[in-house]
């Protein structure tokens, strides 16, 4: 009997194929593109501020205002190896995808910004919002889903203060509007218009772009050009 046609060989081949698929899927899912989610049309209301004492997380704000988290916009402040502050805004129940942000700004990596960097841009940690900021002091990336929202709450760039009834298309300032959120199962693919499906995988290896981070720290440098 041909050993290549044995049951064991066929099972091994299936296992190898599944392993390859899983390894490929894991990093692909991290940066999977997704369509902006639609939002129910609403009549715009007048923008105003409201005091939110001690509410420096989107969950605390929504609880204080008795508002659904899907009607809020949250901020994530990042910086990159190129320097500069990057303020990212997504719907309150979504997560910023750092891989998408890295690609959007043409950087090698992004990391969390410091409180000092945030204040230098004219805003306040825990109360950041995309209204009234100077685009010369920061890059503002807004997820495409946010621009379909209406009458939302967001930070007012003042301590213990938030905006309510903000209209993103009317009130927000930004550098770019694009897909920067982490995709989830059921989201629509922007290419085939099908719906994404998530599957559990096993990561057996990964390549990290470390550049000179560790070599410089360990003084592992060349003594001369040769």
Report the location of each language-model feature:
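Extended, low-hydrophobicity, polar/charged segments
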Residues: 1-226
